[in-house]
């Protein structure tokens, strides 16, 4: 019975990397996508509209990050996002940017652009090390 248990543990260790939801190919694709978003977001409106894409990439990347990286970016993101509430309860999606889809004053627009640039920089650093 012990050898069967040992065999099962070894099999699980060998199989578990294959079952991970975020593969190296996914990571590489997201790295290219972040670079593309930053490169193509030249005007203010495109930066504001691309913020949600950066947040989506961060959510996919989240499980593979160190605790320190998660806490750092979570703190930054939470300061600039609203909880999405449905009947007073957070939805499964969780959070959205405060800025997407709104008409912004010049001061708020500058703040939203700063958020995009800082978030993009933080996520890009995760890929480059």
UniProtKB/Swiss-Prot annotation:
GO BP: any one term: cellular response to UV
Subcellular location: Secreted
Record function comment: A humoral factor that plays a role in stress tolerance; gives increased resistance to the lethal effects of bacterial challenge and stress. Regulated by the JAK/STAT pathway and NF-KB-like Relish pathway in the fat body, upd3 in the hemocytes and Mekk1 in response to septic injury and consequent immune response.
Family the UniProt entry places it in: Belongs to the Turandot family.
Keywords, ordered alphabetically: Antibiotic, Antimicrobial, Glycoprotein, Immunity, Innate immunity, Secreted, Signal
InterPro entries: Turandot (IPR010825)
Superkingdom of origin organism: Eukaryota
Presence of keyword Protease: no
Signal sequence interval, chain numbering: 1-21
Name the UniProt record assigns to this protein: Protein Turandot A
GO-annotated cellular components: extracellular space
Claim: Glycoprotein is one of the keywords in the record: yes
Glycosylation sites: 49
Pfam families with a match to the protein in the record: Turandot (PF07240)
